[in-house]
Amino acid sequence: VLSLFLFLFPESKVSASVNNKTQNLGEKTIEFSELSEEQQTYFLYEGFDENNQYFQQTIIQQPATEGTLQQRVQANVLFITGSTKKITSTSAYTSYVINSSNAPILRTDTRVTLNGYKSFSSSVIPYNSPYVSSGGIYSSYTGAEKYFSVSLASQITTTMGPGAANCRAGGVTLGN
């Protein structure tokens, strides 16, 4: 499965370790035009545009070793895509889209971290187990003005089990 993925997406760089269930194919910065039509529509609705930075990570969930033949031979590819924008001098909004290629999403536990300061979390149980889940998390900082790099981490549970995805989500200057 990994060989096929790398053949189809040769620009991908395998940059992380493999555990017993998932494989991290790394993070990349992408342009607005590289987002799927569905992702573009969502980010535009959230107030983002082609001037924002977008970051994406790819995770492969390995096929099950038990269950039906289809469950045993089909891998699942998870994508998490995120971006952050400043709302006020003390608050920011990070929007994200999670895509699952072959397994419905049962739950997402997502955390946005203003690096070196604080994390903000959200848990979602998507209605009707969709293959796409999206959301956003507000963050705030009221100290002296400071630049924060923003990171996005999500524990994504699908019908194939859990997968963890982490990526940058931009940066923002906050404070008074």
Regions found by a protein language model. Give the residues of each.
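N-terminal prepro-regions of secreted/extracellular proteins
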Residues: 1-87
